[in-house]
């Protein structure tokens, strides 16, 4: 077994996953996220930025976001990006889904009991 010390690296990849509703316009969502990444000054310009559909889940789809930053900027950039994505999604009507349970009540026609 070996231990990898990420603090010795000069750059680190930010990876964020966020759920979006199934009815979301994927093209619009990706454009918005790429714009957020472009505006974030701590993201390294010459490194790849990825926005992709990561998975289909019970209540929505998971969007993956990846970008590179200096190691010392990793946590603050990660937190700020999450907040900016949430604010921008809210402003653009993009729903972040949550698990729901639908319950149908059945009525016994003879007794009227639910």
Task: Describe the function of each predicted region.
Residues 1-11:
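Membrane-contacting alpha-helices and adjoining membrane-interface segments
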Residues 6, 20-24, 28, 34, ...:
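Solvent-exposed, non-transmembrane regulatory segments of membrane-associated proteins
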Residues 10-22:
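Short glycine-/aliphatic-rich beta-strand segments at the starts of folded cytosolic domains
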Residues 40-41:
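Acidic-histidine catalytic/liganding microenvironments
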